[in-house]
UniProtKB/Swiss-Prot annotation:
Record note on quaternary structure: Interacts with PEX19.
Claim: Repeat is one of the keywords in the record: no
Primary localisation category: membrane
Keywords tagged on the record: Glycoprotein, Membrane, Peroxisome, Transmembrane, Transmembrane helix
Transmembrane segments: 97-117, 153-173
Membrane topology qualifier: Multi-pass membrane protein
GO annotation (BP), single: ether lipid metabolic process
CC annotations in GO: peroxisomal membrane
Full protein name: Peroxisomal membrane protein 4
Stored InterPro entries: Pmp4 (IPR019531)
Gene behind this protein: Pxmp4
Keyword Glycoprotein listed: yes
């Protein structure tokens, strides 16, 4: 069934507008907001679903509310950050008449401060995720620019061993320093596996269910 003529005309007008280069910067900001919202849902919803049902107590309603809240906050903040970053980046380029590398840093610095500056669990997870990748990238950039000598052997196995050694040492002896969700995961792996009463909580369940 064909669309009504009015709807076809509207779609043609919208598509014509979207193809005009003079509106590209503004439209890119809008699509960036859209992509940020969608990506936030894709990333947070599965993570919140797994973590909530594995480690959170409460009724099904409370768990679903927690999942929806975490997903909404992540999606909203990421969408607003992309919107702010692209807007500030475009504004700097427009004012100066050209694009500089510093524009990216300043736009993201301001956006990050405004949207991810609050110290909460979600922002903490996002920042730690980025921290590891930024450090990796800076090391590679240092090698690429000649500031760090290129090794003739692969440092990955040593890096892996040090990281795992440190994280288990911190968990066993300085647990409060670790991020809460990491504490929960490691408790499930390394402490809950020390306790069982019968076959049900040895293989089937993590913890025994009290008899009613």
């Amino acid at each position: 069934m064909a669309a009504p003529p009015q709807l076809q005309a509207l779609l043609q007008a919208v598509n014509k507008l979207l193809r005009q280069r003079r509106y590209h910067a503004a439209l890119a900001v809008i699509k960036g907001f859209r992509n940020g919202a969608v990506y936030g849902v894709k990333i947070r919803a599965p993570h919140a679903l797994v973590m909530t049902f594995l480690f959170r107590s409460g009724s099904l309603r409370e768990k679903l509310q927690a999942i929806l809240k975490a997903t909404y906050i992540h999606s909203r903040n990421l969408a607003c950050f992309v919107f702010a970053y692209k807007s500030l980046h475009a504004l700097q380029s427009h004012v100066q008449g050209e694009t500089h590398q510093m524009h990216s840093f300043l736009a993201a610095f301001i956006g990050g401060l405004l949207l991810f500056g609050e110290n909460n669990n979600i922002n903490s997870q996002i920042n730690m995720y980025l921290t590891s990748r930024v450090l990796y990238a800076l090391c590679r950039l240092g090698v690429e620019k000649g500031y760090i000598p290129a090794l003739k052997w692969d440092p990955f196995p040593l890096h892996t061993a040090v990281i795992w050694g440190l994280v288990l040492w911190l968990f066993e002896y300085h647990r409060p320093t670790l991020q809460p969700s990491l504490q929960s995961s490691m408790t499930y792996l390394y402490e809950d596996s020390n306790v069982w009463h019968d076959l049900s909580d040895f293989l089937i369940f993590n913890k025994s269910h009290p008899s009613k």
